[in-house]
UniProtKB/Swiss-Prot annotation:
UniProt organism field: Adiantum capillus-veneris
Keywords noted in UniProt: Chloroplast, Membrane, Phosphoprotein, Photosynthesis, Photosystem II, Plastid, Thylakoid, Transmembrane, Transmembrane helix
Name of the protein described by the UniProt record: Photosystem II reaction center protein H
Superkingdom, natural source: Eukaryota
Name of the gene: psbH
Modified residues (Phosphothreonine): 3
UniProt modification remark: Phosphorylation is a light-dependent reaction catalyzed by a membrane-bound kinase; phosphorylation occurs on Thr residue(s) in the N-terminus of the protein.
Length: 74
């Protein structure tokens, strides 16, 4: 047989590092969700602004928007 499956699990204790101890408080809120919509409307507003920005850049690149006094030569 080319492969072998081992059913043994490691029996040692996990190592506790300094970095793990420092970062553990940041993970204490894992799984908790604030009730309600929270900042979702604000996020939607900024996503819409970003979409408008991207469309504007695309229109300038495609020369769909003519800019007076600015010579564009690609």
């Amino acid at each position: 047989m080319a492969t072998k499956v081992l059913d043994e699990t490691p029996k040692g204790k996990p190592k506790i590092s300094f970095l793990g101890m420092v970062l553990k408080p940041l993970n204490s809120e894992y799984g908790k969700v604030a009730p309600g919509w929270g900042t979702t409307p604000l996020m939607g507003f900024f996503m819409a602004l970003f979409a408008i920005f991207l469309v504007t850049i695309l229109e300038i690149y495609n020369s769909s928007v003519l800019l007076d006094g600015i010579a564009i030569s690609w």
